[in-house]
């Protein structure tokens, strides 16, 4: 078990070279295919139960990793403040849409605020999977290669005062796996210019979704799709 972990005031960069290239997009190209670095930024993976407790990430930049920028599992107490996790999560084994800027699984008491989760190449800005007692506040989640924020099987969560824009999928996706998420509040967010719905959710119970500003999400006038259906979503890659 590991307790009281603090990482702050660092830049963690996975790129191979830092000199200016002729093509400004060449670095992104090398992270998408067989030339990718296959590296993860920061990974804290618990074996069973809450193996970690009291994790704090502050003033931290994690960029240019082909795998997830930051991955945390089985933790009790996570604080992420004033961080920038950008350009992480590419098309590497085990495949696209499985690597993200930030992914947290099987954890509780999570506070994420005043941070950026932008431009994941093939993944989401932020993924919360099987988590309890969480809050995401005053964050920018933009221009990611899949959904902005993906949540699955979470309990007692708040998403407030965030900018969620320009993502290739939905701004917010509530995914159903076996029971669905419940007691989720999504309020006072600006959700705009996402390729699919602003908010889409399946099998979520006791939600409080209101006072969000929607603008030009998807191809339909409808900006939200909240379904009581309990079914898995199959994505076409």
Please name every model-derived segment.
Residues 1, 21-48, 64-72, 92-106, ...:
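Extracellular beta-strand/beta-solenoid scaffold signature
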Residues 3-16, 51-64, 76-91, 100, ...:
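Right-handed parallel beta-helix
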């Amino acid at each position: 078990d590991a307790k009281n972990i603090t990482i702050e005031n660092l830049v963690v960069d996975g790129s191979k070279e830092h000199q200016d290239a002729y093509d400004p997009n060449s670095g992104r190209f090398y992270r998408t295919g067989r030339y990718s670095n296959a590296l993860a930024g920061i990974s804290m993976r618990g074996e069973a139960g809450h193996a970690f407790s009291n994790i704090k990430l502050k003033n931290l930049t994690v960029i240019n990793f082909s795998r997830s920028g930051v991955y945390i599992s089985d933790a009790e107490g996570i604080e992420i403040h004033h961080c920038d996790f950008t350009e992480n999560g590419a098309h590497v084994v085990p495949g696209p849409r499985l690597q993200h800027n930030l992914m947290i699984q099987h954890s509780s008491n999570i506070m994420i605020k005043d941070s950026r989760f932008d431009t994941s190449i093939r993944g989401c800005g932020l993924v919360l999977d099987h988590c309890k007692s969480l809050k995401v506040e005053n964050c920018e989640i933009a221009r990611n290669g899949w959904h902005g924020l993906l949540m699955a099987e979470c309990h007692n969560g708040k998403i407030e005062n965030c900018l969620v824009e320009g993502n290739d999928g939905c701004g917010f996706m509530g995914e159903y796996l076996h029971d669905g998420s419940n007691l989720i509040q999504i309020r006072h967010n600006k959700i705009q210019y996402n390729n699919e719905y602003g908010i889409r959710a399946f099998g979520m119970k006791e939600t409080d979704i209101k006072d969000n500003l929607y603008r030009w999400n998807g191809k339909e006038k409808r900006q939200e799709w909240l379904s009581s259906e309990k079914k898995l979503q199959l994505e076409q890659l």
